[in-house]
Amino acid sequence: GRLVDSVDALGLGEDTIIVFTSDNGPTDWPRYYKEGFTPPGWAGELFGRKWSLYEGGIRMPFIIRWKGAIPEGKTNDATVMAAVDLFPSLHALSSAKLPTDWRLDGQDLSKALQGRKVKRKGPVYWEYGGNPGILKPGNPLFESPTNAMRDGD
């Protein structure tokens, strides 16, 4: 609240895009289980935690505010937006110019941020290979495949 209030008090609300998001999934460090504790964090009704490609491990909270340009008090549960889509989407909302030789990963989903329907051009792909001996979920129940893809709604 104080950040948003300060931006508005300075008269910058219509010129400032504010994004609140976080890392994916609550922690699942094995040490918590070994010490008899449930790890901190909660994935709600979603299955999985960090280091898991189940929804509780990859879904991220995301709130965006741009006074006068992004509808207030609305939710969008239909658009699948990955972190890689954030830069192209924010760039499309801005008047900034990119060097012509830059190629952006991700998809511009700025219309979805503005409350309009958008269909992805292609699937979203997650890969979590890493070294399974180092970062393994503390709860074997949350061990997941090393690859996941979502295509369509």
Put a short name on every predicted segment.
Residues 1-31:
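Metal-dependent active-site segment of extracytoplasmic phospho-/sulfohydrolases and closely related
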Residues 21-24, 58, 66-68, 128-129:
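Active-site-proximal beta-strand/loop segments in catalytic clefts of secreted hydrolases
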